[in-house]
């Protein structure tokens, strides 16, 4: 039976079945191939899409805009300072108004409850471009990238380790995605940075049906052994105060992905992924502030790892992730 997701919200992966998630990944792969060959057919001509960004963005905004334009849709970007949302107008009222003007709405912002409310009252499909709790569109891109870089394998045959802050929206979403798709995921982090226990329990229940393997560990060598992919994210998420940096850097330093971690996988074909942005040098404002405050010892190790001539970046069109292949 054909899969139809017409008029469905996409707020979190927990709302979707494994078959529906696989359908979206396959669709993205086919659209990407069609664009590359010059045969993409526009199916959204005459449609209008609102992009609400209460948090700033580079890749997510560009991905939504380019994808919409490629499919023939028009977009309206509503930035952090360009609307009355949350100031003079509630999200419920905003949803009702925009739902009458637009055919779909993307939201990137704060609490998951906000995008859920938007989805409840808009009357048109709403897509989650990131909340504090989840980042489902990023996970679709990540799973697609994994398949592209593991030819001949299916998602249940793949394993990956996520190192760092596993309680953030990426840790949460990767765990959900892996559970849904029957994958082997290892969340490698200090115990205080593991995902919420209720979500872990929910994912383990899903895994009991899909065959997924979920491991939470503080031991880096145990967590990364024989994985196909290593994944990490920034240690300090958007909106977190600078006062949190010192403790975070101290706690996360052992979970930095560097050459030692690559070697510990014992997999010569392991690949590295980062959802970006990444602070790996002093070439950004935040990077300079961190280096001035906490030094560059660990970064220098990372620079040598990233600059090795046998490593190369391969940005994947419409995925938002960067694999590094040895």
UniProtKB/Swiss-Prot annotation:
Primary localisation category: cytoplasm
Catalytic activity: carbamoyl phosphate + L-ornithine = L-citrulline + phosphate + H(+)
Residues reported to bind L-ornithine: 169, 233, 237-238
Swiss-Prot/TrEMBL keywords: Amino-acid biosynthesis, Arginine biosynthesis, Cytoplasm, Transferase
Enzyme class (EC, first level): transferase
Recorded metabolic or biological pathway in which this protein acts: Amino-acid biosynthesis; L-arginine biosynthesis; L-arginine from L-ornithine and carbamoyl phosphate: step 1/3
Record-listed E.C. numbers: 2.1.3.3
Positions of carbamoyl phosphate binding: 57-60, 84, 108, 135-138, 275-276
Any one GO biological process: citrulline biosynthetic process
Any one Gene Ontology cellular component term annotated for this protein: cytoplasm
Keyword Chloroplast included in the entry's annotation: no
Cell compartment(s), UniProt: Cytoplasm
PANTHER family in the record: ORNITHINE CARBAMOYLTRANSFERASE, ORNITHINE CARBAMOYLTRANSFERASE, MITOCHONDRIAL
Function, as annotated: Reversibly catalyzes the transfer of the carbamoyl group from carbamoyl phosphate (CP) to the N(epsilon) atom of ornithine (ORN) to produce L-citrulline.
The protein's name: Ornithine carbamoyltransferase
Gene name, Swiss-Prot/TrEMBL: argI
